[in-house]
């Protein structure tokens, strides 16, 4: 009898690996504001040492795709919304989920878990830098940007549990993120690795560069 768990797992992983974003090697906005040690390895193009489980990320991709399809159905001619915009500036590529042409708002979809609001929006530097960088990239490519927004969609919640964070676009935030990127690039050039920032429990599950030996990747914070 066919092993259905194995079949589904291999199919999902292969499909995800074939996606353009999965094959992207240049550092994008989503990577800049998180752990600097992971960013260092991204820039250095370190070979992943921890493949981990990709199901949550894969489901997040499908939710993104579903939202995009739903918006296209409601706005088939793109009168209000422009979707999946590929842009680049300062050597940073980005894929913007959604741009509202009427309110000039950059929108980024986030899949979250119910009850994790304390890690969402203003409490999450990585997300804030990311969405303001999207605004910066769009402005550098001729778009008008007035506001940025994050929409958190819980995989395990109800419609009423959807979270929204929005604020006026602030170029200073984007420039702060770009400065952080440049400083980390300089550290890569000098082979100076930042200290680990995350504990073992987090790194083992979520970081592709977790390496208990520390020889190639990152050993996480050691007690």
Where are the regions that the model predicts?
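Metal-dependent nuclease catalytic cores in nucleic-acid-processing enzymes
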Residues: 65-73, 122-151
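Metal-dependent nuclease catalytic regions and adjoining charged, substrate-binding loops involved
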Residues: 2-6, 137-223
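Short acidic, glycine/proline-rich loop/turn micro-motifs
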Residues: 117-121, 160-163
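Metal-dependent nuclease catalytic cores that hydrolyze phosphodiester bonds in DNA/RNA
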Residues: 1-106, 113-120, 129
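Long, highly charged amphipathic alpha-helices
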Residues: 62, 66-69, 133, 176-183
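Short, low-complexity, polar/charged sequence segments that are solvent-exposed and flexible
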Residues: 100, 125-129, 167-172
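Residue-level recognition of conserved beta-strand positions in structured domain cores
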Residues: 109-111, 152
